UniProtKB/Swiss-Prot annotation:
One Gene Ontology MF term: DNA binding
Annotated region (Methionine-rich intra-molecular domain), positions in chain: 149-238
Keywords assigned by UniProt, alphabetized: Activator, Calcium, Centromere, Chromatin regulator, Chromosome, Kinetochore, Nucleus, Repeat, Transcription, Transcription regulation
Name used for this protein in its record: Calcium-responsive transactivator
Gene: Ss18l1
Amino acid sequence: MSVAFASARPRGKGEVTQQTIQKMLDENHHLIQCILDYQSKGKTAECTQYQQILHRNLVYLATIADSNQNMQSLLPAPPTQNMNLGPGALSQSGSSQGLHPQGSLSDTVSTGLPPASLMQGQIGNGPNHVSMQQTAQSTLPTTSMSLSGSGHGTGPGYSHSGPTSQSVPMQGQGAISNYVSRTNINMQSNPVSMMHQQAATSHYNSAQGGSQHYQGQAPIAMMGQGGQGGSMMGQRPMAPYRPSQQGSSQQYLGQEEYYSEQYSHSQGSAEPMSQQYYPDGHGDYAYQQSSYTEQSYDRSFEDPTQHYYEGGNSQYSQQQAGYQQGTAQQQTYSQQQYPNQQSYPGQQQGYGPAQGAPSQYSSYQQGQGQQYGSYRTSQTGPSAQQQRPYGYEQGQYGNYQQ
């Protein structure tokens, strides 16, 4: 089948129709299934043969997309995006996927596709080729392919979406890297950076699934802050956090910092955001996120993909206990952030050494002991006292926690 179709491919490009493209996509899907079957059976020779055919088909589709920009009129919307986004990354056969996939991630996010589900499907598919080919087949797969590709390129070890992140961990990094770079950009300019963060967070969020609200909200909150110097300050610490934290947690840190800043600057907006992110009553987490995000960051250092995302809610729940236990801590901590944005640089260092929610506090106290040592030591017991000085902030956090 594939050979016969391949022989038919050389037909004039003028004859290319939607049916032809659909046949090519169907064939690619069949090839992917065959490759998976042969891989499971250990038949490498057949896998190589089918992969070559698949690669040729993808290159052919990419050539059509490049030569005929008018193909959009012939192709349905999803296939068109696939042709535009997918072929470039697809034709590259995965090695360079990491690069294009990120671009396609932003594109797909801009298109409003659900990257998370796509990513999941893609990762479920397994091999890059499979996801790549599927990408050619449908826009969503394309998006997911890009995500998975970028994830693979950046670092498979990092899962970015809670449930999704487990399957999509690599993708998370790709999106995260984009997000981090964008956050850096954000640092450069608040409105633009916030916009980028929203886009990046949308990628990352889509990868993470539920986190979309939180991240998107975080950028939104940042946007709400607009050009507030506080948000810039938050961004500065964010950038260091993100580099050290490898992306997803970085985003959260930055966002949380934003939130904390937002708390101080635009508390009202921050509240709805956190609540939105945790509509299921995790609102307190959102606020606690500022503190536990650090913990999650530390965890992300330990096992960035699993803890941060696998935890997803579980982390939140785990951290909830720790956070709720250290809710005052969180409150004070976020408060610390307000007064001690200076400590953020130190915190960044603290984040690096901190490996785990509990260890975070200890490590923060240790590495950041100067800054957080007093805060967290007091947080553990006297946190209530510190919270008292920050009674208004506590009230906010209390609301969130509630």
